[in-house]
Amino acid sequence: MIVSRLTFPLQAAKLVARKAAGNPSNSIIQRRHMSGVYFRSGALRPKPDEMPFGLFAIFCAVIPGLFIGATISKNVANFLEENDLFVPSDDDDDED
């Protein structure tokens, strides 16, 4: 019974796939997908230039983000504790 219910949707999906594969505009899209890697002749393009300070740029983005995130979380924890919304109990620290 379940198989008979799935027959029509599966046949419809196969038909849509055949129509999409037969459409010439879809093959153009697939060819353009790799146009950044290959020339029209089929030769590989040269490797792009790398930034000499790429690792430095990553550190300049990550380190301030960590400090800003730590500051925000510290401020939120202080706010929650001051307003008695969340107060950690001392009993939890003694469990070993």
Swiss-Prot record:
Its membrane topology is listed as: Single-pass membrane protein
Give the residue range annotated as the organelle targeting sequence: 1-34
- Detail the disulphide connectivity of this chain as listed in its UniProt entry: none
Keyword annotations for this protein?
Calcium, Calcium transport, Ion transport, Membrane, Mitochondrion, Mitochondrion inner membrane, Transit peptide, Transmembrane, Transmembrane helix, Transport
Q: List the GO terms this entry assigns under cellular component, sorted alphabetically.
A: uniplex complex
One Pfam family matching this protein: DDDD
Locations listed in the record:
Mitochondrion inner membrane
What residue range is the signal peptide?
none
Q: Which residues cross the membrane?
A: 52-72
**Primary subcellular site in the record, as a coarse category:** mitochondrion
| GO terms for biological process, alphabetical | calcium import into the mitochondrion; mitochondrial calcium ion homeostasis; mitochondrial calcium ion transmembrane transport
Stated family? Belongs to the SMDT1/EMRE family.
* Role noted for this protein: Essential regulatory subunit of the mitochondrial calcium uniporter (mcu) channel, a protein that mediates calcium uptake into mitochondria.
Descriptive protein name: Essential MCU regulator, mitochondrial
What are the leading ranks of the lineage?
A: Eukaryota, Metazoa, Ecdysozoa, Arthropoda, Hexapoda
